[in-house]
A protein has these predicted regions:
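Conserved catalytic core of nucleotide polymerization and phosphodiester-bond processing enzymes
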Residues: 1-188
Length: 188
């Protein structure tokens, strides 16, 4: 569980105070965990920084999800000041003054937003593809779809459609859980 908290927390921009709280450790321990994580998995910090820089460099402060939807970062805060409220640019300029340098707020969350938006794109595309294949998903929760199926072979056909919904270099895999209800379903 702790490894999941650390890995997802780092990917999604969790700070040391939040990490300390989640792991029930002191802040110094959380700082050491963060340091060790980034030394062992350096590409995560590079990816986070790259996505954050991409947002900062765009005039409209946006990035696009896998299917092209815009993820906007349109709030601003004073550069170098902690705990100042992020505001739309005109309001930030009025609140903090014309001479105070501003930066885009929350860009540390850009990788999280990109991942979540792209996962939503994939799920939505799978729903469209299933509909076009004559299937009717009954329920969607995050990245899961609930369908009524006749048997395992029918479930496997649905899985094939879902796995092909978005072409990626790394194959997209789908799990199948079967049962009389969502709560009683077991992985097959």
């Amino acid at each position: 569980k702790q490894a999941k908290v650390v890995n997802l927390g780092m990917m999604y921009g969790m700070g040391v105070n939040k990490l300390a709280d989640q792991l029930d450790v002191d802040v110094d321990t959380a700082k050491e965990i963060t340091k060790q994580y980034h030394s062992r998995v350096p590409f995560v910090k590079e990816l986070m920084s790259g996505v954050s820089r991409a947002v900062d460099q765009k005039d409209d402060g946006s990035i696009r999800s896998l299917k092209g939807r815009k993820c906007r970062f349109d709030m601003f805060e004073p550069l170098g000041y902690e705990l100042k409220k992020a505001l739309p640019k005109k309001e930030a300029r009025a609140q903090y003054g014309d001479t105070t340098p501003l930066r885009r707020a929350y860009t540390y969350k850009a990788l999280n937003r990109l991942i979540q938006a792209s996962a939503a794109d994939m799920t939505k595309q799978a729903m469209v593809d299933l509909y076009e294949a004559g299937e009717r998903p009954l329920l969607q929760v995050h990245d899961e779809l609930g369908c009524s199926v006749r048997d395992l072979e029918h479930a496997k056909k649905i899985r094939e459609v879902m796995e092909r919904a978005v072409g990626l270099e790394v194959p997209n895999k789908c799990d199948i859980d079967l049962g009389p209800s969502w709560g009683e379903a077991v992985e097959v």
